[in-house]
Amino acid sequence: MPSNDNKWGIVYCPKSGAFRPQRKWEKVEKCLKDKNIDYDFVQSETSGSVERLVKMMINNGYKIIVVVGGDSALNEAVNCFMQTPKEMRDDISLGVIPNGLMNDFAHFWDMEDNDIEQAVETIAKHRVRKIDLGCIKYTNEKGEKCHRHFLNCISIGLVASVIQKRRKAQGAFLSKLSFIPSSLLMIFQRLEYKMRIKIDTDVIDRKVMTVCVGNAQGYGFTPSAVPYNGLLDVSVVYHPEVVQLVEGFYLLFSGKILNHRSVHPYRTQEIIVEKAERAQISVDGRLMNTPTGPFKIIVQQEVINFIIP
């Protein structure tokens, strides 16, 4: 296998709906050259190509792999990492330059969306921390046993639909604004889902509006979660009254959602969802095909080398 120990392998993921998406790469490229970074890069052409490109980088011996993208691109990268033998994976580190419609995992580490210099300097310093991943284990419609890892969160129910609406907004500016009107639809849709969930010794068997299982901040629904304690935070949201729902928006955007009376927080290593009728599921901000039958969500401790500020 060829060796590229010190050279960065960069996967550039253009932001969906952005005006002149290549402008961001031009800025990244200038910063890399100004700091004399040795790198190779490839550009992702489709939403599903990141995994293939990261695998190519790993097979070509790169030890520092950088994703210029958002949560979904990072999700594809870590799922590729987890298909790599542990002894090989332990020698590779993952960095990010935020460039997605949603960059929640980068925000957890106080990385700014448009501060390219900060991100490049962070990767150049190469301060690495082993982080946890969440993992959903399920059966697909063909009866096959499947799994998918996540960095940030899994959302089940209405919030999964809201996140998807936000992703569909055209342009970065509209995307940031779209979460508010999409969320306001909750008031009028009044959607609930019949769920049966086991969290340690607790059993929740009732109608639920949304469940968020967070390895990190979970778009505000698991604000106390951290990806290095071997635990998942779970927020189960029952259906509030309209006045309480408006209050909930304020608490969500101020990072205090756990103070809301309709939000029931848990911390665990495993959650079993025995039933979630009609509920959509999103993994790191992207909808997945709904599992057939029960599914399990677990945490896998210290499995990825992530470059942090």
Placement of each model-derived feature along the sequence:
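Catalytic core of DAGKc-family lipid kinases
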Residues: 2, 35, 83-209
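Short glycine/serine/threonine-rich phosphate/pyrophosphate-binding segments
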Residues: 50, 73-77, 131
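A generic structural signal for short beta-strands and their flanking turns/coil linkers
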Residues: 191-193, 207-209, 228-232, 267-269
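Gly/Ser/Thr-rich active-site loops/lids in small-molecule metabolic enzymes
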Residues: 170-177, 224-246
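ATP/NTP phosphate-donor binding region
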Residues: 1-68, 79, 121
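ATP/nucleoside-binding phosphotransfer catalytic cores, i.e., glycine-rich phosphate-binding loops
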Residues: 199, 236-309
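Glycine-rich phosphate/pyrophosphate-binding beta-alpha loops
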Residues: 155, 159, 212-223
